[in-house]
Amino acid sequence: MLKLHRLQPARLLASPRRRSAAITATFTLRLYSTPATNETWQSGNLKLSHVVGVSTPPLYENTTGRLLRDLAQTHADHPAIISVHQDVRLTYAELDRRSDILAVNVARQLGIRRGDRVAVCSGNSWEYPVLQLGLAKLGAVLVPLNPAFTDTQFHAALNNSQSRALIIQSHLSRGRRKTSRDITGLIRAATDGNLLPSVEKVVILDSMAAPPEDARMYIALDGERIRPFDSLLKWYSAESAADMPEIAYLHDVAEDRKYANEVINMQFTSGTTAMPKISCLTHRNLTNNGSLIGQRMGITPTDKICAPVPMFHCFGLVLTNLAILSQGGAVVYASETFDARSTLQAVRTEQCTGLQGVPTMFSAELELKDELKKGGHELLRKGIAAGTSIPVEMMNRLIETLNLDQLTICYGMTETSPVSFMTAPGDTLERRCETVGTVMPHTEAKVIAPNMEPGPVDLTPLPVGKKGEIIISGYLLQKGYHNSPSKTFEAMVADPANPEKVWMRTGDEGVMDEFGYLKVTGRLKDLIIRGGENIHPLEIENVLFKHPAVSQASVVGVPDPKYGEAVAAFIQLHEEYHPPRTPSGTISHKPGPSVEEIQTFVETNLGHYMVPKYVWFVPDFPKTASGKIRKVDLKGTALSLI
């Protein structure tokens, strides 16, 4: 049994480049596994759940800003960003130049320096990648904020991240319009030294959903501390690139390389706690993860990928912006926030070749039969589905209806930058639906015996075919959680066989096959234990998706006096099974399935012990802003109903 001894957590943050040096290990003698060679698992001869990705292409060892500079020289006049709802198109050269200007003005007008945090709260727009890349060039840290945060969450996020500046859209949308009064309150708080002591400057970004007068109204509150976003793009004609000392290092490859391991992004993890942890990610983490994703997707400069996913999340910043831009493709924003109809219209007008999304987004798009009949998606082939698995039925519909025959599946977490496993466009339909693919290049992964209790962790890999906790190692690991050394040490464990190596505990349960394909069976914390039987919600959800009337489904565990826990299922039906939506009842519909029919369907496909004791039909699901179903909310609802 491997026994890990952790030293004082403060050492990790004191020397982030040598984080593993802050962790030592003692262990009793035990045969330690050697990771399988690529030839071993690719040929189907893998015995233990331990794989290492290929070491080609080599990792990019420069900054994100330098990557954009190189891309702008290669693809200068090629479209990089297309914001349909703003009617704005930026070439690579324009994106490079605007991000240069923004970097300089953020330094000169806002007083931001390398390492300072800048919070950004905005919907999808051309300004977001300019901010993402401009702040990276300056060496400042982008802190993306979820527009759906409550005022209390905004205050906590700004204080916990110690952001020195806030760039916020004049009109925030959470699926419905948020009033100007709410935003005014946020801005007043941001300029209140007592409430948010770290925030020194506020920049107002005009929203397409509100007139420019709104921004001017906010600026009038405090002309010294509040300014318009346009001012950050002001170019002084007398200056040239050589007159910008703030980003002069970009011209020297060797000088630029010194900063590749610096943090440029602080991401709030997608946990459902009151204030999620803050993951610290570097140039090296993000540029490489994005580039490797784009390569596995097969992105080329001829591709236009429609991206309705939010930019405050890794799916938007990395799997979309960096993945597509790193390969010379174009990113298409259909709307500020996800709108299924706008997405399909943008695909049609821009003749997109790819589409990103989570299953709930794809489901909403497939429901718009009137929009789909208009066509215009004949060029669609590529894309990414992430967040949770895609049922076979949905994948078939995406291929038949939207031509997404090269849709890839990604697995990861914020703390791993985020993708560690991914399918390839050429993988079989079965593997793209039932697994998350194989390990990414320069990444190492294991499946180990699950142990959610504090204390020593056994890092010995399980035999293939055995379920356990997924752990990840490699360049993609975060530097740590901001101001949370104890949480960092719980999640990031040193390898006793190699003190320089650190493993990220994902908290996800999975099983690996002899070819190295990984199947994620669920969150360990979501496991339902019914009468001693382990039940994985994902297995039941995948079966429910097979029912012809079911559009979406989510399963949670609830207390049960006899078995300890019972299965509860929430189901959303397809549009045609909903009751009429008009008083006249002119909209045709089919009768939906009964609770008993659903229970019989599960029993027939899985067995009696997995049959939901409770079944509720719902019109919609509570979701995170990134589109994931909030199981914690469903569990609360279930507890109130039983």
Stretches with model-predicted labels:
Residues 2-13, 17-19, 23, 32, ...:
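Structural core segment of the AMP-binding/adenylate-forming
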Residues 76-79, 203-204, 209-210, 219-268, ...:
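Conserved pre-ATP/AMP-binding loop-to-beta segment of ANL
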Residues 438-442, 453-494, 535:
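Conserved ATP/PPi-binding loop(s) of AMP-dependent carboxylate-activating enzymes
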Residues 149, 155-156, 355, 474, ...:
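AMP-binding/adenylate-forming catalytic core of the ANL superfamily
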Residues 56-60, 77-133, 150-155, 159, ...:
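Conserved AMP-binding/adenylate-forming core of the ANL superfamily
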Residues 221-231, 352-357, 366-432, 444, ...:
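Gly/Ser/Thr-rich phosphate-binding loop
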Residues 287-304, 312-354, 364, 368-369, ...:
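Conserved AMP-binding/adenylation subdomain of ANL enzymes
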